[in-house]
Design a protein with these regions (language model features):
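Bacterial Sec-dependent N-terminal signal peptides
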Residues: 1-27
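Compositionally biased intrinsically disordered regions enriched in Thr/Gly
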Residues: 21-271
Length: 271
Protein backbone atom coordinates (compact mmCIF):
# COMPACT_ATOMS: atom_id res chain seq x y z
CA UNK A 1 0.00 0.00 0.00
CA UNK A 2 2.85 2.33 0.86
CA UNK A 3 4.48 1.74 -2.53
CA UNK A 4 1.22 2.54 -4.29
CA UNK A 5 0.90 5.83 -2.42
CA UNK A 6 4.47 6.78 -3.28
CA UNK A 7 3.86 5.99 -6.94
CA UNK A 8 0.69 8.08 -7.02
CA UNK A 9 2.55 10.96 -5.38
CA UNK A 10 5.31 10.79 -7.98
CA UNK A 11 2.79 10.73 -10.81
CA UNK A 12 1.03 13.75 -9.36
CA UNK A 13 4.21 15.76 -8.92
CA UNK A 14 5.78 15.07 -12.29
CA UNK A 15 4.50 17.10 -15.27
CA UNK A 16 6.88 15.34 -17.63
CA UNK A 17 6.52 12.19 -19.63
CA UNK A 18 6.45 8.98 -17.65
CA UNK A 19 9.11 6.39 -18.33
CA UNK A 20 7.87 2.83 -18.22
CA UNK A 21 10.58 0.26 -17.69
CA UNK A 22 10.76 -3.47 -18.03
CA UNK A 23 13.35 -5.02 -15.75
CA UNK A 24 14.25 -8.66 -15.46
CA UNK A 25 16.40 -8.09 -12.39
CA UNK A 26 18.99 -5.64 -11.12
CA UNK A 27 21.72 -7.06 -13.31
CA UNK A 28 19.85 -6.96 -16.61
CA UNK A 29 19.57 -3.83 -18.66
CA UNK A 30 16.23 -3.12 -20.26
CA UNK A 31 15.82 -0.30 -22.72
CA UNK A 32 12.90 2.05 -23.12
CA UNK A 33 12.63 4.76 -25.72
CA UNK A 34 10.00 7.42 -25.31
CA UNK A 35 9.49 10.79 -26.84
CA UNK A 36 8.00 13.70 -24.98
CA UNK A 37 5.94 16.37 -26.64
CA UNK A 38 5.97 20.14 -26.65
CA UNK A 39 3.48 21.15 -24.03
CA UNK A 40 2.70 24.10 -21.83
CA UNK A 41 2.62 23.35 -18.14
CA UNK A 42 0.58 25.35 -15.61
CA UNK A 43 2.21 28.61 -14.59
CA UNK A 44 2.14 27.65 -10.92
CA UNK A 45 4.52 24.73 -11.44
CA UNK A 46 8.30 24.78 -11.29
CA UNK A 47 8.52 24.53 -15.06
CA UNK A 48 8.34 28.02 -16.57
CA UNK A 49 8.35 27.25 -20.26
CA UNK A 50 7.76 24.73 -23.00
CA UNK A 51 9.88 21.63 -22.63
CA UNK A 52 10.78 19.18 -25.32
CA UNK A 53 12.23 15.80 -24.55
CA UNK A 54 13.69 12.99 -26.54
CA UNK A 55 15.04 10.84 -23.76
CA UNK A 56 16.94 7.60 -23.72
CA UNK A 57 17.08 5.74 -20.44
CA UNK A 58 19.04 2.69 -19.39
CA UNK A 59 17.29 1.98 -16.08
CA UNK A 60 19.89 0.12 -14.07
CA UNK A 61 19.79 0.32 -10.31
CA UNK A 62 22.57 2.35 -8.74
CA UNK A 63 23.45 0.58 -5.52
CA UNK A 64 26.09 2.98 -4.24
CA UNK A 65 24.39 6.28 -3.44
CA UNK A 66 27.73 7.82 -2.45
CA UNK A 67 29.06 7.19 -5.95
CA UNK A 68 25.92 8.68 -7.47
CA UNK A 69 26.31 11.81 -5.33
CA UNK A 70 29.92 12.17 -6.45
CA UNK A 71 28.88 11.85 -10.08
CA UNK A 72 26.15 14.46 -9.64
CA UNK A 73 28.61 16.87 -8.07
CA UNK A 74 31.05 16.34 -10.93
CA UNK A 75 28.24 17.12 -13.35
CA UNK A 76 27.61 20.44 -11.65
CA UNK A 77 31.32 21.21 -11.61
CA UNK A 78 31.73 20.28 -15.25
CA UNK A 79 28.89 22.51 -16.37
CA UNK A 80 30.14 25.58 -14.59
CA UNK A 81 33.88 25.09 -14.74
CA UNK A 82 34.52 22.85 -17.72
CA UNK A 83 36.58 20.17 -16.00
CA UNK A 84 36.22 17.63 -18.77
CA UNK A 85 37.09 19.49 -21.92
CA UNK A 86 39.72 21.93 -23.07
CA UNK A 87 37.14 24.52 -24.05
CA UNK A 88 35.10 25.06 -20.91
CA UNK A 89 31.33 24.97 -20.95
CA UNK A 90 31.06 28.65 -20.14
CA UNK A 91 33.03 29.42 -23.32
CA UNK A 92 30.73 27.23 -25.36
CA UNK A 93 27.70 28.84 -23.79
CA UNK A 94 29.18 32.26 -24.43
CA UNK A 95 29.70 31.34 -28.06
CA UNK A 96 25.95 30.80 -28.43
CA UNK A 97 24.97 33.78 -26.29
CA UNK A 98 23.70 31.71 -23.39
CA UNK A 99 23.10 32.54 -19.82
CA UNK A 100 22.47 29.48 -17.69
CA UNK A 101 19.47 30.49 -15.65
CA UNK A 102 18.14 27.08 -14.78
CA UNK A 103 19.43 23.55 -14.81
CA UNK A 104 17.07 20.68 -15.41
CA UNK A 105 18.60 17.48 -14.14
CA UNK A 106 16.92 14.11 -14.57
CA UNK A 107 13.57 15.92 -14.81
CA UNK A 108 14.05 17.93 -11.61
CA UNK A 109 15.56 21.33 -11.02
CA UNK A 110 18.89 21.59 -9.25
CA UNK A 111 18.75 24.35 -6.68
CA UNK A 112 22.31 24.13 -5.39
CA UNK A 113 24.49 25.85 -7.97
CA UNK A 114 27.76 27.75 -7.53
CA UNK A 115 27.25 31.20 -6.00
CA UNK A 116 29.71 32.74 -8.43
CA UNK A 117 28.04 31.44 -11.56
CA UNK A 118 27.29 34.98 -12.74
CA UNK A 119 31.02 35.47 -13.20
CA UNK A 120 30.82 32.78 -15.84
CA UNK A 121 27.38 33.35 -17.34
CA UNK A 122 26.64 37.04 -17.12
CA UNK A 123 25.76 37.58 -20.76
CA UNK A 124 22.49 35.90 -21.60
CA UNK A 125 18.78 36.03 -22.00
CA UNK A 126 16.40 34.96 -19.25
CA UNK A 127 14.26 33.18 -21.85
CA UNK A 128 17.06 30.73 -22.45
CA UNK A 129 17.75 27.77 -20.22
CA UNK A 130 20.41 25.13 -20.21
CA UNK A 131 18.81 21.70 -20.23
CA UNK A 132 20.37 18.35 -19.57
CA UNK A 133 19.18 15.01 -18.33
CA UNK A 134 20.39 11.54 -17.56
CA UNK A 135 20.88 9.72 -20.82
CA UNK A 136 21.57 6.32 -19.39
CA UNK A 137 23.91 3.72 -18.09
CA UNK A 138 25.39 0.79 -19.87
CA UNK A 139 26.98 -2.21 -18.21
CA UNK A 140 29.69 -4.42 -19.65
CA UNK A 141 30.29 -7.47 -17.47
CA UNK A 142 31.38 -6.07 -14.09
CA UNK A 143 32.24 -2.64 -15.42
CA UNK A 144 29.55 -0.01 -15.31
CA UNK A 145 29.48 3.28 -17.17
CA UNK A 146 27.08 6.02 -16.12
CA UNK A 147 26.40 7.99 -19.28
CA UNK A 148 25.03 11.49 -19.11
CA UNK A 149 23.79 13.51 -22.03
CA UNK A 150 23.20 17.23 -21.91
CA UNK A 151 22.75 19.90 -24.52
CA UNK A 152 22.22 23.58 -25.07
CA UNK A 153 18.63 24.39 -25.88
CA UNK A 154 17.10 27.79 -26.37
CA UNK A 155 13.44 28.33 -25.54
CA UNK A 156 11.96 31.53 -26.91
CA UNK A 157 8.28 32.15 -27.47
CA UNK A 158 7.43 28.48 -27.15
CA UNK A 159 10.00 27.43 -29.76
CA UNK A 160 13.17 25.52 -29.04
CA UNK A 161 16.47 25.35 -30.87
CA UNK A 162 19.02 22.65 -30.27
CA UNK A 163 22.65 23.72 -30.64
CA UNK A 164 24.83 20.91 -29.43
CA UNK A 165 25.06 17.71 -27.44
CA UNK A 166 27.69 16.52 -24.98
CA UNK A 167 28.24 13.25 -23.22
CA UNK A 168 30.12 12.20 -20.12
CA UNK A 169 30.72 8.62 -19.09
CA UNK A 170 31.51 7.86 -15.45
CA UNK A 171 32.91 4.70 -13.94
CA UNK A 172 30.29 3.79 -11.34
CA UNK A 173 32.86 2.09 -9.13
CA UNK A 174 35.00 5.19 -8.67
CA UNK A 175 32.84 8.10 -9.94
CA UNK A 176 35.75 8.90 -12.26
CA UNK A 177 34.94 10.55 -15.57
CA UNK A 178 36.38 8.11 -18.09
CA UNK A 179 35.17 9.52 -21.37
CA UNK A 180 33.93 12.74 -22.91
CA UNK A 181 32.31 13.24 -26.28
CA UNK A 182 31.29 16.49 -27.94
CA UNK A 183 28.62 16.39 -30.59
CA UNK A 184 27.94 19.83 -31.97
CA UNK A 185 25.24 19.45 -34.56
CA UNK A 186 23.00 21.51 -36.75
CA UNK A 187 19.70 22.19 -35.04
CA UNK A 188 17.87 20.95 -38.14
CA UNK A 189 19.36 17.46 -37.99
CA UNK A 190 16.78 14.73 -37.48
CA UNK A 191 17.04 14.32 -33.72
CA UNK A 192 15.99 10.70 -33.58
CA UNK A 193 18.59 9.62 -36.12
CA UNK A 194 21.15 11.82 -34.45
CA UNK A 195 20.61 10.27 -31.04
CA UNK A 196 21.02 6.68 -32.13
CA UNK A 197 24.30 7.67 -33.71
CA UNK A 198 25.49 9.73 -30.75
CA UNK A 199 24.76 7.29 -27.97
CA UNK A 200 26.14 4.40 -29.97
CA UNK A 201 29.31 6.31 -30.69
CA UNK A 202 29.81 7.08 -27.03
CA UNK A 203 29.17 3.55 -25.83
CA UNK A 204 31.48 2.08 -28.39
CA UNK A 205 34.31 4.55 -28.03
CA UNK A 206 34.18 4.38 -24.23
CA UNK A 207 34.21 0.60 -24.19
CA UNK A 208 36.84 0.47 -26.91
CA UNK A 209 39.37 1.93 -24.49
CA UNK A 210 39.10 -1.21 -22.36
CA UNK A 211 38.05 -3.76 -24.96
CA UNK A 212 39.81 -3.01 -28.28
CA UNK A 213 38.48 -6.24 -29.76
CA UNK A 214 34.91 -4.91 -29.99
CA UNK A 215 35.59 -2.74 -33.01
CA UNK A 216 36.36 0.79 -34.05
CA UNK A 217 34.64 4.15 -33.89
CA UNK A 218 34.59 4.36 -37.68
CA UNK A 219 32.92 0.99 -37.99
CA UNK A 220 30.19 2.07 -35.60
CA UNK A 221 29.55 5.15 -37.76
CA UNK A 222 28.95 2.89 -40.72
CA UNK A 223 26.81 0.58 -38.63
CA UNK A 224 24.56 3.28 -37.20
CA UNK A 225 23.66 4.60 -40.62
CA UNK A 226 23.03 1.06 -41.82
CA UNK A 227 20.49 0.64 -39.05
CA UNK A 228 18.80 3.90 -39.96
CA UNK A 229 18.81 3.26 -43.70
CA UNK A 230 17.31 -0.19 -43.27
CA UNK A 231 14.35 1.38 -41.49
CA UNK A 232 14.59 -0.60 -38.28
CA UNK A 233 12.44 1.00 -35.65
CA UNK A 234 14.44 3.11 -33.25
CA UNK A 235 13.05 1.21 -30.30
CA UNK A 236 14.29 -2.09 -31.66
CA UNK A 237 17.59 -0.69 -32.82
CA UNK A 238 18.29 0.82 -29.41
CA UNK A 239 17.23 -2.34 -27.67
CA UNK A 240 19.78 -4.25 -29.71
CA UNK A 241 22.40 -1.61 -28.99
CA UNK A 242 21.72 -1.76 -25.25
CA UNK A 243 21.96 -5.54 -25.19
CA UNK A 244 25.18 -5.44 -27.16
CA UNK A 245 26.74 -2.71 -25.04
CA UNK A 246 26.16 -4.56 -21.79
CA UNK A 247 27.47 -7.83 -23.19
CA UNK A 248 24.13 -9.57 -22.77
CA UNK A 249 24.56 -13.24 -23.64
CA UNK A 250 20.99 -14.51 -23.38
CA UNK A 251 19.19 -12.16 -25.70
CA UNK A 252 17.78 -13.54 -28.95
CA UNK A 253 18.62 -11.36 -31.91
CA UNK A 254 17.98 -12.42 -35.52
CA UNK A 255 21.31 -13.01 -37.19
CA UNK A 256 20.28 -11.01 -40.26
CA UNK A 257 19.63 -8.03 -38.01
CA UNK A 258 22.90 -8.49 -36.17
CA UNK A 259 24.80 -8.58 -39.45
CA UNK A 260 23.53 -5.09 -40.20
CA UNK A 261 25.87 -3.54 -37.69
CA UNK A 262 28.19 -6.17 -36.27
CA UNK A 263 31.70 -6.56 -37.54
CA UNK A 264 33.26 -10.04 -37.24
CA UNK A 265 35.11 -8.82 -34.15
CA UNK A 266 31.87 -7.94 -32.37
CA UNK A 267 29.87 -11.11 -32.92
CA UNK A 268 31.21 -12.88 -29.84
CA UNK A 269 29.16 -10.47 -27.75
CA UNK A 270 26.02 -12.18 -29.01
CA UNK A 271 27.25 -15.77 -28.88
Amino acid sequence: MRNILVLLLLLFLSPLSILFCQKKDDSVLSFVLYQGEDFCVPSDTLFPNFLYQLNFEFPVKMHDEDILCKIQQQLIDSIFYGHYQTTSFDSVARLHGYRIDTILYSNTYLREVPDDRDEYFDYGNSDRIYFFHICGRTVYNQDSLYIVKYHYTEYKGGAHHHYGTHYLAFDTRTAECVHFLDVFGNEYVDHEKRMIYDIGSLVLSALYDKYPEIGSFTRWEEASFTIINDNLTLHYAHYILACWAMGEQDIEIPIDTAKLFLSPNWKHLFQ
